[in-house]
A protein has these predicted regions:
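Short alpha-helical segment of the dimerization/phosphotransfer core of two-component systems
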Residues: 12-17
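Conserved micro-motifs of the catalytic ATP-binding
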Residues: 32-37, 76-79
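A conserved beta-strand-to-alpha-helix junction within the catalytic ATP-binding
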Residues: 38-56
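Conserved catalytic submotifs in the C-terminal HATPase_c
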Residues: 38-42, 60, 65-75
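Short helix-loop "hinge" at the ATP-lid/N-box region of the Bergerat-fold HATPase_c
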Residues: 95-96
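Short conserved segment of the HATPase_c
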Residues: 127-140
Length: 184
């Protein structure tokens, strides 16, 4: 029985370590620009909907109500599909881990002439006594109590990938309101 517990702990910890190493490699490659980027015309609304579908059960488990506002479809942008998926996934994962349970999560998709502005907004479960710039640094986490798993690389990776796709990522913290704006 004890041996089984130890093996389970070892398995979980080795999986965490593997994920950390993968994130470190991706963060390094993304920040130095040594990642292959293949820009193509994509429907951001469709991809966001697919990523949101992957988080549906997790959000329900945390009693998070996802509201996606998109008045126009399709919303065509120039992006690399793999990297855009990772950006959306990182942001949704952050929301799932750090949002106040029982609150609403808003995602607004606003088409513009040659791209789109996509805004993610949620209320943090804990006060964010940290600047927006600090949150985007590697290994920095808004949850200083370390109650959740994570490497503190997600936002840094997302920002680097956005730059590689000729986009921008702006992060705003206002009290416990967390807002990320992606612009393509």
């Amino acid at each position: 029985e004890k041996v089984r517990e130890y093996l389970d702990v070892l398995d979980r910890q080795s999986s965490r370590l593997k994920k950390l190493i993968q994130d470190l490699l991706e963060a390094s490659k993304a920040s130095t620009g040594s990642i292959n980027v293949e820009l193509e015309e994509l429907d951001a609304a469709v991809m966001l909907s697919q990523v949101a579908g992957e988080y549906k059960e997790k959000f329900e488990k945390n009693n998070l109500d996802l509201i996606i506002k998109n008045d126009v479809t399709p919303v065509m942008i120039q992006a690399d599909g793999r990297h855009l998926w990772r950006v959306f996934d990182n942001l949704m994962n952050n929301i799932n881990k750090y949002a106040q349970p029982g609150t609403r999560v808003y995602i607004d998709i606003i088409p513009k002439d040659s791209g789109a502005i996509i805004t993610f907004k949620n209320v943090s479960a804990t006060p964010l006594n940290i600047s927006s710039d600090e949150l985007k640094e590697r290994f920095v986490r808004g949850d200083s109590s370390r109650n959740t798993e994570g490497s503190g690389l997600g936002l840094s990776i997302a920002e680097s990938l956005m730059k590689l796709m000729n986009g921008t990522m702006e992060l705003t913290v206002d009290g416990d309101l967390f807002k990320v704006t992606l612009e393509f």
